[in-house]
From Swiss-Prot:
One of its GO terms (cellular component) is chloroplast thylakoid membrane. It holds the Pfam family PSI_8. The chain crosses the membrane at residues 28-50. Belongs to the PsaI family. It comes from the Eukaryota. This is Photosystem I reaction center subunit VIII. Keywords: Chloroplast, Membrane, Photosynthesis, Photosystem I, Plastid, Thylakoid, Transmembrane, Transmembrane helix. GO terms for biological process: photosynthesis. It is found in: Plastid, Chloroplast thylakoid membrane.
Length: 56
């Protein structure tokens, strides 16, 4: 299967002019955000689960 190379600088018609190209900067924002928030949320939920656990 051939996957075409799609450039990230696709011409989008945005209603306002951005000083940078939005699709090319999205991975640099989303990857650290997911990399930091996902472990933090997991640690908080596991901490709350352990705190609410009762020994019967």
């Amino acid at each position: 299967m051939i996957i075409p190379n799609l450039p990230f600088n696709l011409p989008f018609n945005l209603p306002f002019n951005l000083p940078f190209n939005l699709p090319s900067i999205l991975p640099s924002i989303l990857v650290p955000l997911v990399g930091l928030l996902l472990p933090a949320i997991t640690m908080v939920l596991s901490h709350l689960y352990i705190q609410n656990d009762e020994i019967l």
